[in-house]
Amino acid sequence: MNEYYQPSEIEAQAQKYWEENKSFNVTEDPTKEKFYCLAMFPYPSGRLHMGHVRNYTISDVISRFHRMQGKNVLHPMGWDAFGLPAENAAIKNNTAPAKWTYSNTDYMRKQLTELGFGFDWSREVTTCKPDYYKWEQWFFTRLYEKGLAYKKVASVNWCPNDQTVLANEQVVDGQCWRCDTAVERKEIPQWFIRITDYAEELLADLDKLPNWPEQVKTMQRNWIGKSQGVEMRFDLANPIAGTTGFDVYTTRPDTLMGVTYVSLAAEHPIAKALAETNPALAAFIQECKVQSVAEADMANMEKKGIDTGIKAKHPITGDEVSVWVANYVLMDYGSGAVMAVPAHDQRDWEFAKKYDLEIKQVIAPEDGSDIDLTKEAFVDKGVLVNSGEYDGLNFNAAFEAISQTLQAANKGKVTTNFRLRDWGVSRQRYWGSPIPIFNLPDGGVIPVPADRLPVLLPEDVQMDGVQSPIKADKEWCKAELNGQAVEHETDTFDTFMESSWYYARYTSPNADSMLDPDKANYWLPVDQYVGGIEHAILHLLYARFFHKLMRDEGLVECDEPFERLLCQGMVLKDGTKMSKSKGNTVDPEDLIKTYGADTVRLFSMFAAPPEQSLEWTDSGVEGAFRFLKKLWKAVASHLEAGSAGEIDANSLDEQQKALRRKTHETISKVSDDYGRRQTFNTAIAAVMELLNEITRSADRSTPNGLAVEREALEAATLLLAPIVPHACHALWQAFGNEVAVLDAPWPTVDEAALVKDTITIVAQVNGKVRAKLDAPANADKDALEKIALADESVLKHIDGKMIRKVIVVPGKLVNIVAN
């Protein structure tokens, strides 16, 4: 072999071998244990960045490791290809989104191949292609038929810049997650899917995911937001526009006797009815429409409101309280109305302070300590005071008593509530899957029949940056059903629809149905999913929901899509996330040209544990490159020294035994690091230590010495093969192995090699270490005592003293007490 490491040549040869042998194309094989490894597919933005490289290196390392353990491994790749950035890029570059997208996927596929990722490209899915979205459309029509998809006029988050609806999760600090424009509230007809029907199961089944990060499960639990509370009726003193009252939901019925006013959301029907004759209220409602609805913002923003002048009756006392419209009340949680208890809710307290409303204490600390309501609300649970017959009750007793009073008076009931809202899937954009619905002349709707799917999105369009080309195309909108003129729905699906089921389509990408159940049930669930924690709520919750919908359609059998989840950290440079705007990006292509793909892979796995952020350093990349050159050189010089035979374990000297022990200790550690712990950085460090040991203590003067070195170098090659596959492919061949390293079995630990003939024990005199001694590993207490008492350093420290006792801890120490 060439004594110098030449990555470009080595990597081209390995990639050619994998391509010619279709090394990563797999089929179902019931005789083998399957392993489905998946990294979140990329948006085809045009070029890979270091975040992609890290993400896909992790999944590739895991895939190759499990393959070497004899499993049937599926590791597919595709493109999350619909979405707004393609529209924006098309406008900017004066091209069609489809053309821009396909040219990007071609370029990025080449980049992924150059990095040596072992993807089964025969299963590639591209979500903007009709053979993919046809089945999404078909599935939506099935959901519609089951009553799980519906249309209603809804108040939505509207991005005036992107001219589209945003999910609550896509509003960050009151701004669009994509373009940072201030988000407004707007009412338009929208399509929804009833994710709330599955809220209970989505919550409960998080307990079936022991191999998910606790943080992700907590985020989902909080997002689903199950709570137990009381729904109660506040009657209006005088009816408004035919409405006699409104419902309020609270998790704190124990504070009901402290209600001093009630607040309605700006979008509440009563508020809207009053606004028709109240210009000040109408203006205030308009102002509320452009404020953030993100929880964090609502907690911190200035609380504002307007007194409607009408009164509502307290459901227990019958006392009249004023009705306000307030900017901190959300229409889509509970019922869009809250009972205000300023003494025991901080938002109500801030509002009451601003508008000089009564603050009435009804809860006192259980320990009898004082509270100061002039400074802030007392929000903890405690004991009821100033609450008539309920005084002295704690939270649980008050919850029970007050809810029973309300129930008996037909004014309320105990209910379970969820923060989770139904998923709004309509988008007023062009580059997405058309929603498969016909709008009828009478205003009704009907799903497009299955034999007329897919509803094709025209790809050869001109983008004007103002209106969706399909909305503007009157011919496209026109259709006919049973001789009647109908119109195509011009909204498209939220792109989270595509990413909610792509993992399942990979199992049968060419099926003439949504999934082939036999293939899907062989491969699913995904055994290992890899992706960023920023997808904890949206994508991961929607995918879990979609999986349950597919299960209930009889397409899959398992309850959950992803068995184990690894959320990789970000790639930083100069302490901040790499981004074009900050000018701190590193181009993977330049690195591959300079150092080769293996160096890039090695550095990105070695620099930090996978869940932590990785700080990019040029010196770290140089270090990874140096290590590969050192490994290459070690193998080349070993092979030059002659051919190695079998190890004769019975005639090894101490040095050879030590190197063998180090080899098998490394195999044991690295196997655990790859499999159970998934700490690839410590696996690499262990192989580096082994290589240091080889260069330090290899003995080529005897056949046994050469054989022990060969075993160590072959082990190092196998252990690094998942991380630096090109170099290891070439090294494994150089050792004369017929089978490619990709298909070589993972090395096993020889337990006999781990056994030590001798051990080091500590000799102490009066508790102070005086010597470190070698002793036979099987020496008993008497033998260890004799060895310690024969050592010169020990003798020197007990000379002239009387030995009172000798304490022996086998395998560790001998302590002589003398005075």
From Swiss-Prot:
Enzyme class, first EC level, given as a word: ligase
Alphabetized UniProt keyword annotations: Aminoacyl-tRNA synthetase, ATP-binding, Cytoplasm, Ligase, Nucleotide-binding, Protein biosynthesis
Main location: cytoplasm
Motif 'KMSKS' region per UniProt: ranges: 577-581
Enzyme Commission no: 6.1.1.4
Binding residue positions for ATP: 580
InterPro entries documented for this protein: aa-tRNA-synth_I_CS, aa-tRNA-synth_Ia, Leu-tRNA-ligase, Leu_tRNA-synth_edit, M/V/L/I-tRNA-synth_anticd-bd, Methionyl/Leucyl_tRNA_Synth, Rossmann-like_a/b/a_fold, tRNAsynth_Ia_anticodon-bd
Record flagged with keyword Ligase: yes
Localization terms from the record: Cytoplasm
GO cellular component: cytosol
CDD domains xref list: Anticodon_Ia_Leu_BEm, LeuRS_core
Span(s) of short sequence motif 'HIGH' region: 42-52
Gene Ontology terms, MF aspect: aminoacyl-tRNA deacylase activity; ATP binding; leucine-tRNA ligase activity
Catalytic activity: tRNA(Leu) + L-leucine + ATP = L-leucyl-tRNA(Leu) + AMP + diphosphate
GO BP term, example: leucyl-tRNA aminoacylation
Family: Belongs to the class-I aminoacyl-tRNA synthetase family.
PANTHER family reported in the protein's UniProt record: LEUCINE--TRNA LIGASE, MITOCHONDRIAL (PTHR43740:SF2), LEUCYL-TRNA SYNTHETASE (PTHR43740)
Protein name stated in the entry: Leucine--tRNA ligase
Natural source organism: Saccharophagus degradans (strain 2-40 / ATCC 43961 / DSM 17024)
The encoding gene: leuS
